Curated annotation (Swiss-Prot):
Its EC number is 2.7.1.148. It comes from Streptococcus agalactiae serotype III (strain NEM316). It comes from the Bacteria. One of its GO terms (biological process) is terpenoid biosynthetic process. Belongs to the GHMP kinase family. IspE subfamily. ATP binds at P94, V95, C96, A97, G98, L99, G100, G101, G102, S103, T104. Transmembrane segments: none annotated. This is Putative 4-diphosphocytidyl-2-C-methyl-D-erythritol kinase. It catalyses: 4-CDP-2-C-methyl-D-erythritol + ATP = 4-CDP-2-C-methyl-D-erythritol 2-phosphate + ADP + H(+). InterPro entries: GHMP_kinase_C_dom, GHMP_kinase_C_sf, GHMP_kinase_N_dom, IspE, Ribosomal_Su5_D2-typ_SF, Ribsml_uS5_D2-typ_fold_subgr. The active site is at K10, D136. Keywords: ATP-binding, Kinase, Nucleotide-binding, Transferase. Catalyzes the phosphorylation of the position 2 hydroxy group of 4-diphosphocytidyl-2C-methyl-D-erythritol. GO terms for molecular function: 4-(cytidine 5'-diphospho)-2-C-methyl-D-erythritol kinase activity; ATP binding.
């Protein structure tokens, strides 16, 4: 029996660092959306008690450092599963890009194993497992437009956004999320008004939404990688309604109210970076 799951990428329309918790992690407030740039996870059972991962990508580890392996290992141990599993990852989401590729693959693995082994986990049980792996995994279990709070474990669905076009630009380097979070100074970091952004979404006010979007991590990443600022400027000069880094970077995305605008931004960036994508929001 094979189980097939689609694993969509995510974007941060808003990412605010509210402070540092006593355990060293940060309290977050984020608004996230899913886009139609997808990885695909195919899972089948093995007789041997092991976890085997293979992929069409050579840009990530296929051992216990992979979030997919961690998801399978936690579930096997938690539910006393003595069977093995083969996990095939077909990658389209760039690695170490701020698009949640590892997190969405882990979430897809949790959903798939729940079906394969008939574990009958409810959403909260899957979230608890996902949160052990990473702060974006709980969101990726359900996706869509959502408010994400705490350390990532609190996910509250929001209304679907109006249709629009997204252009993604991924520079030719990756970013370590841990290294960016290590450099956060909660006293001086730029803040994002997530409540205002949420209000704009609830009232379907597109203009207010794009004005309210922001990312507290952007300045830190730009200090290390100034090309991100150049990408934003080029996108805005090409007619993007907004240009913003997602996650800890380095991917920059623009939102465009029409496909014509998106095509103009896309064409302006193709000669500047190798990895440029035109996608839609998932509804």
């Amino acid at each position: 029996m094979r189980i097939f799951e689609k694993a969509p990428a995510k974007l941060n329309l808003g990412l605010d660092i509210k402070g540092r918790c006593d355990d060293g992690y940060h309290e977050l407030a984020m608004i996230m959306v899913s886009i139609d740039l997808n990885d695909y996870v195919t899972i089948s059972e093995l007789k041997e008690d092991c976890i085997v991962i293979d992929s069409d990508s050579s840009k990530m580890p296929l051992n216990n450092d992979n979030d997919v392996f961690k998801a399978a290992d936690i579930i096997k141990n938690q539910y006393g599963i003595n069977k093995g599993v083969h996990i095939r990852l077909e990658k389209s989401i760039p690695v170490c890009a701020g698009l949640g590729g590892g997190s969405t693959d882990a979430a897809a693995t949790i959903r798939a194993l729940n079906r394969l082994w008939n574990l009958q986990m409810d959403y909260d049980e899957m979230v608890a497992i996902g949160f052990k792996i990473g702060s974006d995994v709980p969101y990726c279990l359900g996706g869509g437009c959502s408010l994400v709070l705490g350390k990532g474990e609190i996910v509250k669905p929001l209304p679907t956004l109006r249709p629009c076009w997204i252009v993604l630009v991924k520079p030719d380097f990756g970013i370590s999320t841990k290294s960016i979070f290590r450099d956060i100074d909660c006293k001086s970091i730029s803040r994002v008004d997530i409540d205002l952004l949420k209000s704009a979404i609830l009232s379907s006010d597109y203009q207010l939404m794009v004005k309210s979007m922001g990312n507290s991590l952007e300045d830190i990443t730009i200090t290390k990688n100034p090309v991100i600022s150049t990408i934003k400027e080029r996108m805005l000069n090409s007619g993007a309604d907004v240009a913003l880094m997602t996650g800890s970077g380095p991917t920059v995305f623009s939102m465009c109210s029409t496909e014509k605008k998106a095509d103009r931004v896309f064409n302006s960036m193709k000669g500047f970076c190798k990895e440029v994508y035109k996608v839609r929001l998932l509804r």
